[in-house]
Regions:
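Non-catalytic terminal extensions that flank enzyme cores
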Residues: 1-25, 44-48, 79, 87-93, ...
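A generic signature of intrinsically disordered, low-complexity regions enriched in glycine/proline
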Residues: 7-12, 61, 158, 172, ...
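N-terminal Rossmann-like or analogous alpha/beta NTP/dinucleotide-binding catalytic cores
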Residues: 14-153
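Active-site cores that bind ATP or allylic diphosphates and position pyrophosphate for catalysis
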Residues: 125-212
Length: 212
């Protein structure tokens, strides 16, 4: 109920809706802090911004299926957001798995999305390239393949206008836009068409090996 109240409030107050999510797949690190958490908190304090921040715990299942790790990582990530100054009274802060409508929308979007669109996703293609020609899909789960689709549901569920992303996520935003445009063509102007925002100075944060 609170999410739809905020949706209409944002619409009538002519605010820009900005959505940011972080996958709780381990302990928070400097990349999370500098690339997503601090910029999102700063932006949420602006008067013309309706900020949506969430823990993408379903996405974390792609890399591991340990419920204890997912739970503890979610708590640690939430604590990191709050300790860095997130004001939950001015921001919609939620856990992905608490919003069942996201998975419902994920299914609906999957029914209008062609497989070829997801075949071109960089994460999937990179995983295939690492395998042999005889077994191109070895150890690749459907979660990885459908990752851009669930990300689309995350974004379109709340009609985000702006989605801050790293350079590696720009293609996923383009996929989201394609899906939203196709849905709107068939069913009317249901979804906003989101735009990616990339900070050129934070596109890549090099690790201690100088690579990643």
């Amino acid at each position: 109920f609170i999410y739809f109240n905020k949706f209409y409030l944002s619409f009538f107050m002519n605010k820009i809706r900005v959505l940011t999510g972080i996958t709780p797949s381990g302990k928070p690190h400097i990349g999370n802090l500098s690339g997503a958490i601090l910029p999102a908190i700063k932006e949420s304090q602006e008067k013309n911004v309706d900020s949506f921040l969430f823990l993408a715990d379903y996405h974390s299942l792609i890399k591991h299926q340990d419920p204890i790790l997912t739970h503890s990582s979610s708590i640690e990530m939430a604590a990191c957001w709050l300790s860095c100054g997130l004001d939950h009274t001015k921001t919609t802060f939620y856990r992905q798995s608490d919003i069942s409508n996201i998975m419902e929308l994920n299914w609906i979007l999957s029914c209008i999305t062609e497989k070829g669109l997801l075949n071109r996703a960089h994460a999937y293609k990179d995983a295939v390239d690492k395998n042999s020609i005889d077994f191109p899909d070895k150890n690749i789960n459907m979660g990885l393949f459908n990752y851009p689709l669930l990300m689309s549901a995350d974004i379109l569920m709340f009609n985000a206008d702006i989605v801050p992303v790293g350079l590696d996520q720009v293609q996923h935003l383009e996929i989201t836009r394609d899906i939203a445009l196709k849905f709107n063509y068939h069913y009317g102007e249901v979804f906003s068409i989101p735009e990616a925002r990339v900070d050129d100075h934070k596109g890549h944060l090099l690790g201690i090996d100088g690579l990643k």
